[in-house]
């Protein structure tokens, strides 16, 4: 076989070699290129940013309103809609959505959705307004309530849990009904805690709660056992005309202000280890058979043990 390279192949090699040589010469003769980072984009004016955020917020609110309209026709979407509204509060605590919820949680509303659950854990809720609503479970564990929290005439047909929550202003539960008990253990009430005329069925706990201002349980009706063990009542406190169907437990409680149990009735009152402050000008009216012992210095002030 011949070892001579065919002419066409030699021509192809020459052409490629020439092209490469020309490219090298061209790159050598061009000035060096210096790469500089591009300048950061100009920030948007504050007014534009605020408008975009407002538009985005309004779009989300409109989507929730549309979902509520769909849920009116499809009951299977109703709990999802309620959950989405509560999720919106996580990123936008002041969202104007309480009116939307009330429209669907009030029994006298033509758009009432029965059997809805409210479930919020470790969040912030502002200006809560559930007046006259009826829900099944109400779980608000470790929630911070900013502004007044309105639960007047609210009916809870299932479990209720406010454990370790904090009310920064007034907590208003006038005439609320807890049909399966409630848990307010370790809850902090910074402003007025108003529970006049409430009714409970099932065990109810306020153990280790802190009431910093006026506390009102006047005419409350506790259908089963209730415990205020270790509670701190710093302001004026009233249980006037309250009704306890079982033993009312106030063991280790602290009463730092006025205390009024006039007309309160229980199967028995237990105040073991409870104390009342005696070095401030306050008035105390205890249930029959309950008296204060000799005052003793304790930080702060002087306290007497109830017995």
Put a short name on every predicted segment.
Residues 1-40:
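Membrane-embedded hydrophobic alpha-helical segments
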Residues 42-307:
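N-terminal leader/targeting and pre-domain segments
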């Amino acid at each position: 076989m011949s070892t001579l390279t065919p002419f066409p192949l030699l021509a192809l090699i020459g052409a490629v070699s020439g092209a490469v040589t020309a490219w090298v010469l061209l790159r050598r003769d061009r000035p060096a290129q210096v790469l500089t980072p591009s300048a950061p984009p100009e920030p948007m004016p504050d007014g534009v940013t605020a408008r975009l955020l407002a538009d985005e917020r309004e779009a989300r609110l409109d989507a929730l309103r549309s979902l509520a309209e769909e849920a009116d026709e499809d009951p299977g979407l109703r709990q999802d809609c309620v959950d989405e509204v509560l999720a919106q509060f996580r990123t936008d605590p002041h969202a104007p959505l309480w009116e939307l919820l009330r429209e669907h949680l009030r029994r006298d509303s033509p758009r009432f959705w029965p059997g809805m659950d409210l479930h919020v854990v470790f969040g912030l809720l502002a200006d809560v307004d559930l007046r006259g609503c009826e829900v099944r479970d109400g779980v608000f564990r470790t929630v911070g309530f900013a502004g007044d929290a309105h639960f007047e005439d609210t009916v809870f047909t299932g479990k209720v849990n406010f454990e370790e929550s904090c009310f920064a202003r007034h907590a208003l539960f006038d005439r609320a009904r807890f049909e399966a008990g409630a848990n307010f253990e370790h809850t902090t009430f910074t402003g007025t805690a108003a529970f006049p005329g409430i009714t409970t069925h099932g065990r109810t706990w306020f153990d280790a709660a802190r009431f910093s201002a006026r506390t009102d349980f006047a005419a409350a009706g506790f259908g089963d056992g209730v415990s205020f063990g270790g509670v701190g009542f710093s302001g004026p406190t009233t249980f006037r005309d309250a009704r306890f169907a079982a033993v009312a437990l106030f063991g280790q409680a602290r009463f730092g202000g006025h205390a009024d149990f006039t007309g309160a009735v229980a199967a028995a009152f237990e105040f073991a280890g409870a104390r009342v402050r005696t070095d401030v000008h306050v008035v105390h009216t205890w249930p029959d058979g309950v008296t204060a012992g000799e005052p003793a210095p304790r930080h702060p002030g002087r306290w007497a043990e109830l017995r």
